């Protein structure tokens, strides 16, 4: 994962701040966090809640300053900054993490989870703990998973009910080889574009559609320019909340336990927010006149994913995790 020159220059100030901060003792400055979602989004509120709990339980000694809305760059950028200690904590989607750790391909597999409940039980259990632990060799401490809902396709051209309806469409995907392969297997043209640039790409016809969850579809105003939403629910990949190993190593054992405790408690808080947000977002996009196709037969989509699974699930550990998750259905 390497920053391009333009992005590197734009993020030089936060990086320098991070380097200077490393010389300070934990508690002399706020912990810094980042999120590409806007203030008020469930993941942002969950991380803020984590910070509030941490501050309350340390009488303000450990506190958090969170930077939402992509203020410090895209997720790939902020993940790299976190690895090098310029950020202390970070909420990112699994897509940029896929780039550095193949174990994280498992929960991002299309049609792996049969329901949100299945996903939550799997990630709260042993499979989730193994996946979080796989981040440690990369300079990251996996704290917890947050919901990212069910990703579905939406576009500006026509209703989609079958994979054939996607044929030839330019579909924005996250910068992940797995997502590229998934969309290509459906006969569409995958187009990696940073999250913050998708609205203009839809307006200008750079892409015809994208895939994301309902709250993101609403929150980004993508529904204004891409009114056809097909509820395929093809991916239920979670968000992951991480801490820099460099920050973790400077915490006392008691503070590490407290960080994990507060992160764990932020999960049900986030899920309650998420469930409410999904319902309200659905109502909003319907009121805006969008066409929601919720009775789609997903089996033809699922049938095309076998080669994608074969391409990305190649290690014994990945295969064991898939079996363990399927057994929890």
What kind of feature is each model-predicted range?
Residues 2-4, 12-18, 22-117, 127, ...:
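N-terminal secretory/targeting leader peptides
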């Amino acid at each position: 994962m390497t920053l391009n020159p333009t992005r590197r220059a734009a993020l030089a100030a936060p990086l320098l701040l991070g380097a200077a901060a490393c010389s300070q003792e934990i508690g002399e400055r706020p912990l810094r966090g980042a999120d590409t979602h806007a203030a008020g989004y469930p993941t942002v509120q969950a991380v803020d809640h984590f910070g509030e709990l941490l501050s309350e339980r340390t009488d303000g000694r450990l506190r958090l300053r969170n930077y939402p809305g992509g203020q410090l760059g895209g997720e790939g950028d902020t993940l790299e900054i976190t690895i090098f200690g310029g950020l202390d904590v970070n909420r990112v989607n699994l897509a940029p993490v896929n780039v550095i750790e193949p174990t994280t391909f498992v929960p991002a597999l299309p049609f792996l989870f049969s329901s949100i409940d299945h996903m939550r039980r799997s990630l709260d259990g042993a499979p989730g703990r193994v996946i979080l632990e796989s981040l440690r060799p990369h300079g990251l401490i996996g704290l917890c998973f947050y919901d990212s809902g069910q990703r579905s396709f939406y576009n500006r051209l026509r209703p989609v009910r079958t994979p054939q309806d996607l044929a030839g469409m330019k579909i924005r995907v996250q910068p992940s080889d797995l997502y590229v392969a998934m969309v290509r297997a459906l006969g569409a043209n995958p187009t990696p574009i940073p999250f913050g640039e998708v609205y203009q790409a839809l307006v200008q016809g750079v892409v015809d559609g994208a895939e994301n969850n309902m709250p993101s579809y609403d929150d980004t105003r993508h529904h204004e320019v891409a009114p056809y939403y097909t509820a395929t629910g093809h991916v239920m990949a979670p968000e992951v909340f991480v801490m820099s190993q460099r920050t973790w190593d400077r915490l006392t054992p008691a503070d590490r336990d407290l960080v994990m405790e507060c992160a764990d408690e932020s999960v049900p808080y986030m899920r309650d927010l998420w469930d409410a947000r999904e319902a309200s977002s659905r109502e909003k996009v319907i009121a805006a006149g969008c066409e929601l196709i919720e009775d789609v037969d997903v089996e033809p989509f699922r049938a095309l994913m076998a080669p994608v699974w074969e391409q990305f699930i190649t290690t014994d550990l990945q295969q064991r995790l898939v079996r363990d998750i399927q057994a929890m259905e």
